[in-house]
UniProtKB/Swiss-Prot annotation:
The keyword Nucleus applies. One of its GO terms (biological process) is GMP biosynthetic process. GO terms for molecular function: IMP dehydrogenase activity; metal ion binding; nucleotide binding. This is Inosine-5'-monophosphate dehydrogenase 1b. It comes from Danio rerio.
Amino acid sequence: MADYLISGGTGYIPDDGLSAQQLFAVGDGLTYNDFLILPGFIDFTSDEVDLTSALTKKITLKTPLISSPMDTVTESSMAIAMALMGGIGIIHHNCTPEFQANEVRKVKRFEQGFITDPVVLSPHHTVGDVLEAKVRHGFSGIPITETGKMGSKLVGIVTSRDIDFLSEKDNNKYLEEAMTKREDLVVAPAGVTLKEANDILQRSKKGKLPIVNDKDELVAIIARTDLKKNRDYPLASKDSRKQLLCGAAIGTREDDKYRLDLLTQSGVDMVVLDSSQGNSVYQINMIHYIKQKYPELQVVGGNVVTAAQAKNLIDAGVDALRVGMGCGSICITQEVMACGRPQGTSVYKVAEYARRFGVPVIADGGIQTVGHVVKALSLGASTVMMGSLLAATTEAPGEYFFSDGVRLKKYRGMGSLDAMEKNTSSQKRYFSEGDKVKVAQGVSGSVQDKGSIHKFVPYLIAGIQHGCQDIGAKSLSVLRSMMYSGELKFEKRTMSAQVEGGVHGLHSFEKRLY
């Protein structure tokens, strides 16, 4: 045996790594890439890991993921998909109060399998309009009503079978000539269950099943393609009435009180006070107002990055805190305003303080990979809010476009001039609605197509579970208790360590995540 090797028992284990307290004791601001978590002992499978976590004082999610209130990330389609997967979506407020309230209403009224806001045309639209809708939305089975709107009398339907063999000169042909007429349609009455509707659709061998009320007005539609996708969502985030959970963002100005009233009438479960710097008299006054008028409504305050900021909002009565300033991929606040904080340090410092008062923390921004999600949760965050990671999914607002053969969707910061020019709500978020000269705190860009949330979020969930398994934490509550007890160990990474931890030494490679 080599002379440097010692023969003996294994009772001795050297101290290794740093506790979170030691890691953040130094004054350096740390991002998620600046450290790693040391592995622990595995005695369970990854699918046993429980990801249940508190969103607010009274709302718990089975998946700790939230979609950000940005106008290129979250409207009703995203919020529905996130809630079905066990997370929640926060509807943006860079729009009219009426539009936002209607988006919330769509989420709360959602029934799995029933499409309540399909593309609808009138008999006076043309075949060209159908072809255009097919390019934009990817399907051509479109119900035809008298006015071209939902709630109007059903007069027919146009499917690919009706138009596939028409020539280009027929593009101006009216749909009343091309459509399948009402008398030839199979329909189901309003109030039918999803199972009954599915049975009718299967027996009829049709592609679409319109749902009509007793006046023969269109109220919903079921698609055969959705039948294949229809499955149980055991993790779905629901309220006591079995409706999907939905949040919405509002500002802190006087006119936001009207927006708040409309949102509560729509059944919103929580409001997020959307401000780049939450420690303000405006936000504190708004928290007091909401808690007085709607005491049961959950209120998320922020954004904050220090315990001192958090204290004022906790004292005002918030039910959760949103943490992050200048760390988003499209955010230039730190560059322009010289204000902010690296996100790793922000999450740890605020979460460590807020937990003493039972206030959960949402890590908002800077999430580029599933590993970053695990790191945020290991630093004390209860949930993680994502923007760019969910942008360019099928459910995100906006239309796809191609650039150099790559399928993209637009993504922009709410502090970008683009967003500010669209609506004053974005200006209020950055306290600049009265400024003659607008100072941008965000940029506009594009993100590559990621496919559907229904495929992407399961990848994130599996990644978080595997991360917790490697750490040796069977649940997120165990993960946080390990961190606060000092059992969870971290290690700083040098720049060369970060290079080593990524793909390196290859001539070329393809990175497929799922």
